[in-house]
Amino acid sequence: IELEGLLEILGYQSTGGCYRHDSRQVIFVGDFIDRGPHQRRVVELVRSMTESGAARAIMGNHEYNVIAYYTPRTNGGYLRERSAKNTGQHQAFLDEYARDAHDWAEAIDWFKTLPLWLDLEGIRIIHACWEKTSVDQILEFQNGSNLLGDELLHASGDPTTWQYKAVDTILKGKEIRLPNDGHF
């Protein structure tokens, strides 16, 4: 897969099914799924690297979206609507795990363990937009944690909440309406 080739170009070597480097650690910034072929292999590779300490990873909007797609609302339905558009976005991921519900559930559970951001010495890593207000609100709500958590997940599934806005901003970025219905 392309990711393995990129890791090799960067000097990582595969040992025991996990890519490692002698002097550095890769940081993955999410969107392991819903982009291109071999999504299951990408998830397995990133997971093995993070669990062995050879890498760090954060959640992207694609991981969040698939978590919400499979998380039931307390009042029925799912946190992410099961529309044709949303199903289509996840179809390749669904297809790759179609015969193995256990591995699929394990992948979703692993996505839930990914931090929303990393605030490391001298560098901050976030999928889309480091907005201090959103980060601070989440930290306060989560008692200092940068993990999604069930309460934040459910609250962020409601577009009328500040949690929705905060999670949407850090995972997708700010959206600004352009004049004259412009786009880029």
PLM regions and their residue ranges:
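Active-site neighborhood of divalent metal-dependent phosphoester bond hydrolases
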Residues: 36-43, 48-178
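Short, intrinsically disordered, charge-balanced linker/junction segments flanking boundaries
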Residues: 1, 178-184
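N-terminal active-site segment of His-dependent metallophosphoesterases
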Residues: 1-45
